[in-house]
Amino acid sequence: LFATVLAISASTSALPAIANPISNPISSQISTSSIPAKNIGISGSNQFTQRSLNLAKQIPTDVIGLVMMDLEPKSWQMLDTSQATDPVTAIDKLLTSFGQLPQISIVKDIQPWLGKEVLIAFFSNTDNKFEFTFTALSTISDDKKFEFFLKKLKSLDLPKPIETLYQNVKILEWQLEEDSVGDKKPVLSHKLNSRNSLQSLLRLKQNTPTNTKDNEEDSDPEEIEPTTPIFLNFSIKRFAIAKLPSGIAVISTNRQMIQKMIDTSAEMPEQRLPSLADNPLFLRSLNNPLWNRSLIAGYGDFKELGKISELLAADLPETSEIPGFSRKEYIESLQYTLSQYSSFDLFTWVTPKGLRSQSNSYFSEVRSPIPKDSATRDRLLSYLPSNVYGAITSRNLNRQWQWFVEESKQQSTYKILVEGVRMLVPLMIGAGFDLDIEKDIISWIDGEYAVVVFPSDRSPFQETGIDLTIGALIRTSKPEVANATLAKLTKQLSKLSGDFIQVKKRQIGATVLTSFEFPDTRESGKTQSIFAYGWRDRQTLMLTLGANTASAFIPIPKPALAESEMFRDAISDMPQPNFGYFYLNVNVIAKQVATLGFLLFASNSDIPPSQDKSSQPVLPDEIKKVIDRLGGAVFVYSETSDRFQSDLFFGLKP
């Protein structure tokens, strides 16, 4: 965020889609979206699309990506009906909560002149391919307060700014670190709090005595802590700030980027650089009605992202025994993936029931439509219990696996997944066991499948205080193949475990289960089930941790997950068809985490005498109020002929 960047700078420092034959060029896919900027129709009261376009006119077209945030408090008020939410104030509180005490106050020094929107953009550095250029823009609501802010910025304990006049625009630049001379190498941080960070630089500037140079000369090189590069260092070496002729404030880690932005508004057409507002790919995203509804919207260019592939692979070794983990293999795989797509966008908005987000990765060329699947969908949702921690549902694992196998021939990074799965059986059961995981297991999972984590007082882990258990349902058109595999696995496990694990038959309702059981230490002669499987119907296989937990699925649970209001709210406007749901009951999970955290905290603190230490702790009202607002969250993937789409819903109660 613009305000955050200014405060920190001055004071303290997409999943590939299932491949389909390619037919139509990208031009046909964006022809209806590449409407000239002047013809964009604006809907909605806040005109976020138009305000975004005004800032985009200052952005050079070679941007890697950008994020646009609406700072209008009334746009956020649906998140909290009791009062208008101010996102800038929230950011200031967030920094304070992390112990940041900046010399520049976001609320006092920046918010008074900050406009109603902020844009953050990322560029590759043309002078150094191992660096990003980070730039933020915002309209100026009060020129005098902006000038006062610049005056205060100059008064800080920072190197004296360099003033440059470019096309009659004054640019102030602070050089915080010396640029490296010679070959440009990827900048790697040696530890989390790098001495190269701006925060450390300021601390050293304030605390280092005047004879530091002499001390450094006398220091023993062997006493210097050896460090190993771990991750890329995005520390700020310099930053520049200016007010563009359009009245927009800009801060950037590269002065030349500000100059390019000035050139996008040059009076002479022959001197004017093309801006993002002229880019048809960006206009396609901007014309999406979701942009105008969004609190946060984003756009990115895969072609520009590919230019920094060497930066992304900077820490990888030249050679590796692990497939796909050498620098060359990684870059080749990354470039192949990026070539399949043209651009991406992101939208996040508020609904009466919670937060919604959507991300689209557009194919480089329009693909043939996915063959229509007439099979019944989401049947298993009616067989799952409603009281769950989380659930994953999808369909046709066999087809998904075949796609991964084909992609691994083009992308070496997928080889580790494919080969890893193929090695599972030898690693878990032994190399002498005759079982092909692809032919004997994956091949018959050709229908819907679901995995669910849920609470149960019959969990096999109940005696340890854990009520969590796991169950799975699998629809298949090849039950005979599944039975042959299950019989083979049962025989092998019985052989390996000797007399410790016993295989018994259990019955839950009308379903007969094969149960794997071990001696119950609590009662002599009894056994306890750890895993069970059986056929819920002729084509639905059920697997559970513990035979008794199967009662959650048999007979049809009432209410089922499909009937849960929280789940229905989460999936109500998700695209259909899709690849399945990844669902979390955030409310229940948050209660469990908070209770566990309170127990851990209470065990190390003084508990009031009136509270019974052996009883279940009562959460503070403030925490309960926050948790009670939480609902369910669901993540969904889908695909059309022109894009791969992901959707997210996060439930929030009023």
Predicted regions located by residue number:
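Short linear motifs at secondary-structure transitions and domain/linker junctions
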Residues: N39-S45, K93-G99, K108-L114, K145-K151, ...
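Hydrophilic extracytoplasmic domains
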Residues: S374, P385, I392-E448, F454-E463, ...
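Gram-negative bacterial Sec-dependent N-terminal signal peptides
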Residues: L1-I18
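Leucine-rich, highly hydrophobic segment in Treponema pallidum outer-membrane-associated proteins
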Residues: I18-R51, L55-Q58, E216-A266, S275-R395, ...
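Charged/polar, solvent-exposed surface patches and flexible loops
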Residues: K57, Q77-T81, K93-T96, P112-W113, ...
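Short secondary-structure boundary/capping segments
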Residues: S82-D86, S265-P269, L312-P317, Y362-S364, ...
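Single conserved position on a long alpha-helix in the C-terminal lobe of the eukaryotic protein kinase
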Residues: V67, I110-P280, I442-D569
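Structural boundary/hinge residues at secondary-structure and domain interfaces
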Residues: S13-S180, A297-G300, E304, R356-P460
